[in-house]
């Protein structure tokens, strides 16, 4: 039995930046530092930051006056920003720059008076933040959430001739393209972004897991259950006809999964650290894996800048 590692896998530039912002804020300003929502969707990462002095909250009313708060990588609505400013909270924004790009698109369409269709998953914090970029004060348009092709058939927009779409950044590329095509059939005048809103890291990891699926009879995806991009990776492998499981760490591996398998693929979502992948590799060796190789994959060199106040110190 051998193991084939996907490449790229694990942390993307937006996740790296968000985690580093929390670490450096704690080091520079001292604990506690409040973080609105899990900074990234990974239990191991969140637990580590808690031990360092981060306090995770869901709403700003849980943050004391005069405290420092960090917005998670998923972004926040304009209402949250306004509330933080009204209360005089010190804010570090860890929103992924690629999510911020989507926010700017929605705000631009809103100012132009367009209706906007957001393709995404209801309840996901990124979607809530993006939906929250629309406001009546910014323009007369409306924003609508579409989760799947079936909803396109029943969608009723106010301005079919003045309509644009945007997407959550962590969706399945194939699912999203199908929804966009259905929207274009129904609303031929619909505008779209100049470049795909699904981020480069999501695309690269989805391409890599499909490469794994072609060569393996089992694919394990390291990631937490609430990680959208990690769930999509496991779904894609299963869609390609390969048994696949999403696991938080090595302890969740069921030895029965390995029985009779010759080639095991291993990847990790964009919010899962390499240390968890290493733990899974160690467990697979205990279960009989005797060789590990790595796909070539798509090189990634993207780095996102930290806030100016946090650029001077290094955190291990």
Curated annotation (Swiss-Prot):
Positions with a binding annotation for [4Fe-4S] cluster: 12, 96, 199
EC numbers for this chain: 1.17.7.4
MF terms (GO), sorted A to Z: 4 iron, 4 sulfur cluster binding; 4-hydroxy-3-methylbut-2-enyl diphosphate reductase activity; metal ion binding
Pathway it works in: Isoprenoid biosynthesis; dimethylallyl diphosphate biosynthesis; dimethylallyl diphosphate from (2E)-4-hydroxy-3-methylbutenyl diphosphate: step 1/1; Isoprenoid biosynthesis; isopentenyl diphosphate biosynthesis via DXP pathway; isopentenyl diphosphate from 1-deoxy-D-xylulose 5-phosphate: step 6/6
The UniProt record lists the keyword Acetylation: no
Binding residue positions for isopentenyl diphosphate: 41, 74, 124, 227-229, 271
Highest taxon of source: Bacteria
List of residues binding dimethylallyl diphosphate: 41, 74, 124, 227-229, 271
UniProt-listed CDD domains: lytB_ispH (cd13944)
GO biological process terms on file: dimethylallyl diphosphate biosynthetic process; isopentenyl diphosphate biosynthetic process, methylerythritol 4-phosphate pathway; terpenoid biosynthetic process
Chain positions recorded as (2E)-4-hydroxy-3-methylbut-2-enyl diphosphate binding sites: 41, 74, 124, 169, 227-229, 271
Active site: 126
Cofactor dependency: [4Fe-4S] cluster
Cofactor note: Binds 1 [4Fe-4S] cluster per subunit.
Keywords per UniProt: 4Fe-4S, Iron, Iron-sulfur, Isoprene biosynthesis, Metal-binding, Oxidoreductase
Coiled-coil residues: none
Reaction(s) catalysed by this chain's protein: isopentenyl diphosphate + 2 oxidized [2Fe-2S]-[ferredoxin] + H2O = (2E)-4-hydroxy-3-methylbut-2-enyl diphosphate + 2 reduced [2Fe-2S]-[ferredoxin] + 2 H(+); dimethylallyl diphosphate + 2 oxidized [2Fe-2S]-[ferredoxin] + H2O = (2E)-4-hydroxy-3-methylbut-2-enyl diphosphate + 2 reduced [2Fe-2S]-[ferredoxin] + 2 H(+)
HAMAP family with a match to the protein in the record: IspH
Function: Catalyzes the conversion of 1-hydroxy-2-methyl-2-(E)-butenyl 4-diphosphate (HMBPP) into a mixture of isopentenyl diphosphate (IPP) and dimethylallyl diphosphate (DMAPP). Acts in the terminal step of the DOXP/MEP pathway for isoprenoid precursor biosynthesis.
UniProt similarity note: Belongs to the IspH family.
The name this protein goes by in its record: 4-hydroxy-3-methylbut-2-enyl diphosphate reductase
Species this chain originates from: Xanthomonas campestris pv. campestris (strain B100)
């Amino acid at each position: 039995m051998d193991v084939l590692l996907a490449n790229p896998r694990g942390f993307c530039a937006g996740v790296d930046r968000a985690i580093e912002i929390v670490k450096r804020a704690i080091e520079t300003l001292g604990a506690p530092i409040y973080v609105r929502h899990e900074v990234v969707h990974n239990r191991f990462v969140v637990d580590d930051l808690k031990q360092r002095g981060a306090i995770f909250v869901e709403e700003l009313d849980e943050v004391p006056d005069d405290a420092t708060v960090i917005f998670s990588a998923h972004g926040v609505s304009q209402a949250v920003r306004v509330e933080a400013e009204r209360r005089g909270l010190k804010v570090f924004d860890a929103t992924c720059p690629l999510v911020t790009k989507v926010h700017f698109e929605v705000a631009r369409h809103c100012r132009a008076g367009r209706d906007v269709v957001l393709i995404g998953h209801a309840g996901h914090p990124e979607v809530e933040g993006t939906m929250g970029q629309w406001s009546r004060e910014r323009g007369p348009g409306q924003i609508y959430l579409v989760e799947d092709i079936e909803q396109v058939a029943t969608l009723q927009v106010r301005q079919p001739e003045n309509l644009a779409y945007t997407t959550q950044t962590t969706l399945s590329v194939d699912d999203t393209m199908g929804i966009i095509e259905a929207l274009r059939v129904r609303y031929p005048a619909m505008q779209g972004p100049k470049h795909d809103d699904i981020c480069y890291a999501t695309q690269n990891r989805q391409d890599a897991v499909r490469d794994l699926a072609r060569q393996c009879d089992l694919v394990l995806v390291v990631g937490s259950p609430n990680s959208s991009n990690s769930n999509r990776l496991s779904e894609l492998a299963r869609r390609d006809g390969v048994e696949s499981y999403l696991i938080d760490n090595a302890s969740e591996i069921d030895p029965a999964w390995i029985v009779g398998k010759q080639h095991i693929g291993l990847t990790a979502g964009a919010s899962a650290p390499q240390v968890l992948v290493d733990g899974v590799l160690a467990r697979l060796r205990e279960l009989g894996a005797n060789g590990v190789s790595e796909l070539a994959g798509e090189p990634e060199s993207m780095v996102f800048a930290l806030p100016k106040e946090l650029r001077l110190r290094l955190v291990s």
